[in-house]
Amino acid sequence: MASATVVSQIQSLYIIKPRLSPPPPPHRQFRSIYFPTTRLLQQHRFRQMKSVVIVPATAAETARKRYPGESKGFVEEMRFVAMKLHTKDQAKEGEKEVTEPEEKAVTKWEPTVDGYLKFLVDSKVVYDTLEKIVQDATHPSYAEFRNTGLERSASLAKDLEWFKEQGYTIPQPSSPGLNYAQYLRDLSQNDPQAFICHFYNIYFAHSAGGRMIGKKIAGELLNNKGLEFYKWDGDLSQLLQNVRDKLNKVAEQWTREEKNHCLEETEKSFKWSGEILRLILS
């Protein structure tokens, strides 16, 4: 799970005109002075045409402006919003202005094994929670994300066992992981769109920036030992694409307002993940 801050340091109008058609001509067998003449019909049509009022189209009639990435599917919208939350130094699409002290660039990258273990332990708490929520599927859409191949809980358990065998003491989960896990449980009960935002950002960030961090930690602290946390069974790019397809399928059932609500949760996802990531430097 990589935060926007720390990861970077490692690197028309429709006008409806009435159709004016003359009344049907009278049946020849019943010609009468009461039927209008051709001249009268022409005058009637002219008066009708002069009375046509052109009014602006309603909002529903006007073509809706598409959101960035919308034409490619909702996942592309999510990616676009996530990239905007980076600074210009972190990504070319970045628009975020640094306003908080914790958002400032890390001037000293000095990870420790103890700090990294805290990060792994708290990460496992979050992945355990995600996988249980998806497995229980209190909301029907969650079932779509069972057994995606992106699950990390079992891999983290193996890594923590390896550290234990090397003589390290495994710490207890701390507040960043415990609080985030509780937040995810609460969201999953009443706010599926917001929960799925976190699901997407956690798994996809780990597959990108998370791997960069893992490689750097392995080189600096673990004698290039590759952890299971950064390994997947099968082609990772295909696993990610399968989940993208599922996310797009689920989002097709949402209203535009629900989609926007999901996107608005992105910044909170970055905040929670960033707190766990900073444990590496503790």
UniProtKB/Swiss-Prot annotation:
EC number(s) given by UniProt: 1.14.14.18
Keyword DNA-binding: no
Tree of life domain: Eukaryota
Alphabetized GO MF terms: heme oxygenase (decyclizing) activity; metal ion binding
Cited Pfam families: Heme_oxygenase (PF01126)
Tissues where the protein occurs: Highly expressed in root nodules and, to a lower extent, in leaves, shoots, roots, flowers and pods (at protein level).
Keywords attached to this entry: Chloroplast, Heme, Iron, Metal-binding, Nodulation, Oxidoreductase, Photosynthesis, Plastid, Stress response, Transit peptide
Major place of residence: plastid
PANTHER family for the chain: HEME OXYGENASE 1, CHLOROPLASTIC-RELATED
Annotated protein name in UniProt: Heme oxygenase 1, chloroplastic
Lineage, broadest ranks: Eukaryota, Viridiplantae, Streptophyta, Embryophyta, Tracheophyta
Designated gene of the protein: HO1
